């Protein structure tokens, strides 16, 4: 991460106000000020990292737990029928704030916004080789 604090770090530190919905030692969550739908929240690690793969295992684990807890509460409180969890890494992926963050976007029967993408058929030979390389890279 750069030396300059992200807007999210500044929110965590209380420099900017927000509508907080959750906080623990590792995670901070608040309502998005430009929501896609009612109940749209951002879930961020307190650890400053630009990309998901740069987070510590502990922050990653705590984010996973928080996403589940917050999603459940959003569904119960808003009456949403479904939700999207979106996380972008890098500008080509649509990331505009370079501090890891997840969007939980509630969906309602009248919701029209979709994150559906055009798909392609996978080449089985290429897929086999790629899967082996990714697997080896994890070990």
How should these model regions be labeled?
Residues 1-139:
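HIT superfamily nucleotide-processing domains
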């Amino acid at each position: 991460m750069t030396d300059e604090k992200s807007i999210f770090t500044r929110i965590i530190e209380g420099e900017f106000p927000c509508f907080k919905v959750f906080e623990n030692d590792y995670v901070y969550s608040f309502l998005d000020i430009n929501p896609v739908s009612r109940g749209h929240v951002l879930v961020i690690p307190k650890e400053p990292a630009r990309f998901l793969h740069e987070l510590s295992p502990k922050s990653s684990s705590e984010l996973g737990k928080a996403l589940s807890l917050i999603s459940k509460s959003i569904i119960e409180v808003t009456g949403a029928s479904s939700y999207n969890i979106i996380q972008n890494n890098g500008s080509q992926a649509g990331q505009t704030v370079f501090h890891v963050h997840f969007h939980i976007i509630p969906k309602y029967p009248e919701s029209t916004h979709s994150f559906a993408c055009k798909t392609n058929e996978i080449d089985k030979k290429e897929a086999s080789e790629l899967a082996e390389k990714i697997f080896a890279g994890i070990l």
